[in-house]
Design a protein with these regions (language model features):
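A short, Lys/Arg-rich alpha-helix, primarily the initiator
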Residues: 1-20
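Residues that mark the N-terminal boundary/hinge immediately upstream of a DNA-recognition element
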Residues: 13, 24, 50-53, 64
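Key DNA-contacting residues within the recognition helix of helix-turn-helix
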Residues: 15, 40-41, 50, 69
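The alpha-helix within a helix-turn-helix
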Residues: 18, 29, 58
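Short alpha-helical DNA-recognition segment
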Residues: 22-41
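The DNA-contacting recognition helix of HTH DNA-binding domains
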Residues: 25, 36, 46-47, 65, ...
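DNA major-groove recognition helix of helix-turn-helix/homeodomain DNA-binding modules
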Residues: 33, 52-68
Length: 86
């Protein structure tokens, strides 16, 4: 089995990420200013958030954007990690 396949198996779903910080769909919806249906669509993989919403979502969940991207099934291979420039 390829290494990428192994990594994909360990990727948490958006629902798992949300539940890991004890947020309900309604609470996350309220915090982000989006409808509950949108949160559900994201969790079911029916749509993915715009970049600005993805940034807000990552902040609310306390996760890196790369982790969020993986939860949507997006490849982040070759995307550099953020590094402090200060």
């Amino acid at each position: 089995m390829r290494k990428a396949d192994d990594e994909e198996q360990d990727v948490p779903t958006l629902k798992t990420l949300r539940e890991s910080v004890n947020l309900t769909q309604p609470e996350l919806s309220r915090r982000m200013g989006v409808g509950i249906r949108i949160i559900g669509d994201w969790e079911r993989g029916e749509s993915i958030p715009r970049f600005d919403r993805a940034v807000s979502l990552a902040k609310e969940l306390g996760i890196p954007l790369k982790t969020l991207a993986r939860s949507f099934g997006l490849s982040v291979e070759g995307v550099p990690n953020d590094e402090s420039t200060n």
